A protein has these predicted regions:
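Glycine/Thr-rich beta-alpha phosphate-binding loop at enzyme active sites
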Residues: 69-81, 95-141
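Hydrophobic faces of well-ordered beta-strands that scaffold small-molecule active sites
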Residues: 6-12, 27-31, 58-60, 75-77, ...
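Short, acidic/polar
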Residues: 11-23, 62-65, 102-109, 154-160
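N-terminal active-site wall of soluble small-molecule enzyme domains
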Residues: 26-90
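Acidic (Asp/Glu)-rich catalytic clusters
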Residues: 19-25, 50-53, 89-92, 111-112, ...
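Glycine-rich phosphate-binding active-site loops on the catalytic face of alpha/beta enzymes
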Residues: 34, 75-87, 117-132, 153-177
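Alpha-helix-loop-beta-strand connector modules within alpha/beta enzyme cores
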Residues: 43-59, 82, 86-103, 131-154
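Boundary/entry segment of secreted carbohydrate-active catalytic domains
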Residues: 1-16, 176
Length: 177
Protein backbone atom coordinates (compact mmCIF):
# COMPACT_ATOMS: atom_id res chain seq x y z
CA UNK A 1 0.00 0.00 0.00
CA UNK A 2 1.36 3.39 -0.98
CA UNK A 3 1.12 6.47 1.20
CA UNK A 4 -0.79 9.27 -0.42
CA UNK A 5 1.42 12.22 -1.25
CA UNK A 6 0.51 15.27 0.78
CA UNK A 7 1.01 18.79 -0.51
CA UNK A 8 3.54 20.79 1.50
CA UNK A 9 3.21 24.49 2.27
CA UNK A 10 6.11 26.41 3.82
CA UNK A 11 5.57 29.83 5.42
CA UNK A 12 8.56 32.12 4.91
CA UNK A 13 9.23 35.72 5.91
CA UNK A 14 12.63 36.22 4.31
CA UNK A 15 14.55 35.36 1.15
CA UNK A 16 17.04 32.74 2.37
CA UNK A 17 18.33 30.60 -0.50
CA UNK A 18 19.97 28.11 1.90
CA UNK A 19 16.60 27.12 3.38
CA UNK A 20 14.76 27.30 0.04
CA UNK A 21 17.29 25.01 -1.68
CA UNK A 22 16.73 22.29 0.97
CA UNK A 23 13.09 21.94 -0.12
CA UNK A 24 11.87 19.81 -2.99
CA UNK A 25 10.03 21.11 -6.03
CA UNK A 26 6.61 20.10 -4.72
CA UNK A 27 6.79 22.51 -1.78
CA UNK A 28 4.63 25.62 -2.13
CA UNK A 29 6.08 28.75 -0.52
CA UNK A 30 3.83 31.30 1.18
CA UNK A 31 5.48 34.64 1.90
CA UNK A 32 4.14 36.45 4.95
CA UNK A 33 5.77 39.24 6.88
CA UNK A 34 3.46 40.57 9.58
CA UNK A 35 6.25 42.58 11.22
CA UNK A 36 6.13 45.28 8.55
CA UNK A 37 3.08 47.12 7.31
CA UNK A 38 4.43 47.57 3.78
CA UNK A 39 5.57 44.75 1.49
CA UNK A 40 9.04 44.97 -0.03
CA UNK A 41 8.13 44.63 -3.71
CA UNK A 42 11.73 43.99 -4.77
CA UNK A 43 11.98 41.05 -2.36
CA UNK A 44 8.70 39.61 -3.64
CA UNK A 45 9.80 39.89 -7.28
CA UNK A 46 13.18 38.28 -6.48
CA UNK A 47 11.43 35.44 -4.63
CA UNK A 48 8.99 34.95 -7.52
CA UNK A 49 11.82 34.74 -10.06
CA UNK A 50 13.95 32.43 -7.92
CA UNK A 51 11.09 30.05 -7.04
CA UNK A 52 9.79 29.99 -10.62
CA UNK A 53 13.25 28.94 -11.84
CA UNK A 54 13.28 26.16 -9.23
CA UNK A 55 9.78 25.02 -10.20
CA UNK A 56 8.09 25.89 -6.88
CA UNK A 57 4.76 27.66 -6.47
CA UNK A 58 4.75 31.03 -4.70
CA UNK A 59 1.82 32.61 -2.84
CA UNK A 60 1.55 35.92 -1.02
CA UNK A 61 -0.20 36.25 2.33
CA UNK A 62 -3.02 38.72 2.84
CA UNK A 63 -2.50 40.92 -0.25
CA UNK A 64 -4.80 39.88 -3.07
CA UNK A 65 -4.12 42.90 -5.31
CA UNK A 66 -0.34 42.50 -5.17
CA UNK A 67 -0.56 38.76 -5.86
CA UNK A 68 -2.56 39.52 -9.02
CA UNK A 69 -0.37 42.46 -10.02
CA UNK A 70 2.83 40.38 -9.87
CA UNK A 71 1.11 37.34 -11.42
CA UNK A 72 1.93 35.07 -8.48
CA UNK A 73 0.52 31.56 -8.18
CA UNK A 74 -2.03 32.66 -5.59
CA UNK A 75 -2.86 34.25 -2.28
CA UNK A 76 -3.19 33.04 1.31
CA UNK A 77 -5.92 34.65 3.44
CA UNK A 78 -5.15 34.36 7.19
CA UNK A 79 -7.89 33.68 9.71
CA UNK A 80 -8.08 37.35 10.75
CA UNK A 81 -8.91 38.41 7.17
CA UNK A 82 -12.72 38.49 7.05
CA UNK A 83 -13.04 40.72 3.98
CA UNK A 84 -14.85 39.79 0.78
CA UNK A 85 -13.63 42.59 -1.52
CA UNK A 86 -11.28 40.22 -3.38
CA UNK A 87 -14.35 38.56 -4.90
CA UNK A 88 -14.75 41.65 -7.12
CA UNK A 89 -11.47 40.95 -8.94
CA UNK A 90 -11.15 38.58 -11.85
CA UNK A 91 -8.35 36.05 -11.56
CA UNK A 92 -6.53 33.89 -14.07
CA UNK A 93 -7.29 30.19 -14.37
CA UNK A 94 -4.53 28.71 -12.21
CA UNK A 95 -4.71 31.35 -9.43
CA UNK A 96 -5.01 29.64 -6.04
CA UNK A 97 -6.81 31.09 -3.02
CA UNK A 98 -5.99 29.48 0.33
CA UNK A 99 -7.22 30.44 3.79
CA UNK A 100 -6.77 29.48 7.42
CA UNK A 101 -9.29 28.93 10.20
CA UNK A 102 -9.37 27.91 13.85
CA UNK A 103 -13.07 27.19 14.35
CA UNK A 104 -16.35 26.53 12.51
CA UNK A 105 -17.24 30.21 12.17
CA UNK A 106 -13.93 30.96 10.45
CA UNK A 107 -14.32 27.89 8.21
CA UNK A 108 -17.68 29.20 6.96
CA UNK A 109 -16.12 32.63 6.33
CA UNK A 110 -13.29 31.05 4.32
CA UNK A 111 -15.77 29.02 2.27
CA UNK A 112 -17.70 32.22 1.51
CA UNK A 113 -14.41 33.91 0.53
CA UNK A 114 -14.03 31.24 -2.16
CA UNK A 115 -10.87 29.49 -0.96
CA UNK A 116 -9.87 26.19 -2.57
CA UNK A 117 -8.20 24.80 0.56
CA UNK A 118 -8.60 25.60 4.25
CA UNK A 119 -5.66 25.43 6.66
CA UNK A 120 -6.96 24.37 10.08
CA UNK A 121 -4.72 25.08 13.04
CA UNK A 122 -3.31 24.25 15.37
CA UNK A 123 -3.14 20.46 15.10
CA UNK A 124 -0.34 19.71 17.54
CA UNK A 125 0.53 21.46 20.79
CA UNK A 126 2.51 24.58 19.91
CA UNK A 127 0.26 27.06 21.70
CA UNK A 128 -2.66 27.12 24.15
CA UNK A 129 -5.40 26.75 21.56
CA UNK A 130 -4.27 23.57 19.82
CA UNK A 131 -7.00 21.21 18.64
CA UNK A 132 -5.55 17.73 18.86
CA UNK A 133 -6.45 14.94 16.46
CA UNK A 134 -10.07 14.34 17.51
CA UNK A 135 -11.17 17.99 17.47
CA UNK A 136 -9.27 18.50 14.21
CA UNK A 137 -11.17 15.59 12.60
CA UNK A 138 -14.49 16.91 13.90
CA UNK A 139 -13.95 20.50 12.72
CA UNK A 140 -12.56 19.44 9.34
CA UNK A 141 -15.58 17.19 8.71
CA UNK A 142 -17.81 20.29 8.46
CA UNK A 143 -16.19 21.43 5.22
CA UNK A 144 -16.20 19.97 1.73
CA UNK A 145 -13.05 21.94 0.82
CA UNK A 146 -9.56 20.45 0.83
CA UNK A 147 -8.18 20.54 4.37
CA UNK A 148 -4.55 21.29 5.20
CA UNK A 149 -3.13 20.60 8.68
CA UNK A 150 -1.24 23.50 10.25
CA UNK A 151 0.64 23.96 13.48
CA UNK A 152 3.26 22.02 15.42
CA UNK A 153 4.06 19.55 12.63
CA UNK A 154 7.53 18.05 12.81
CA UNK A 155 9.33 15.14 11.17
CA UNK A 156 8.54 13.04 14.28
CA UNK A 157 4.77 13.41 14.10
CA UNK A 158 4.17 13.27 10.33
CA UNK A 159 3.06 9.63 10.60
CA UNK A 160 -0.01 10.82 12.52
CA UNK A 161 -1.08 12.84 9.48
CA UNK A 162 -2.03 9.59 7.73
CA UNK A 163 -4.90 9.24 10.22
CA UNK A 164 -6.46 12.46 8.97
CA UNK A 165 -8.45 13.16 5.83
CA UNK A 166 -6.22 16.00 4.61
CA UNK A 167 -4.74 17.08 1.31
CA UNK A 168 -1.56 18.52 2.79
CA UNK A 169 0.25 20.11 5.70
CA UNK A 170 1.84 23.47 6.37
CA UNK A 171 4.29 24.97 8.77
CA UNK A 172 7.63 26.52 9.47
CA UNK A 173 9.54 24.32 11.91
CA UNK A 174 9.03 21.12 9.85
CA UNK A 175 10.92 22.64 6.93
CA UNK A 176 13.72 24.06 9.06
CA UNK A 177 14.62 20.81 10.88
Amino acid sequence: MHDKLLKKYYFINSFDTNIINKQDKTTTFIYRDYKTTKFDTNKILKLKTYLKRRGNKFLLANNFKMALKFKLDGVYLPSFNNKFDHLNYSTYSNFTILGSAHNLKEIKIKETQGVQSIFISSLFKKNNNFLGINKFKLISSYSKKNIVALGGISKKNTRVLRLLNISGFAGISYFEE
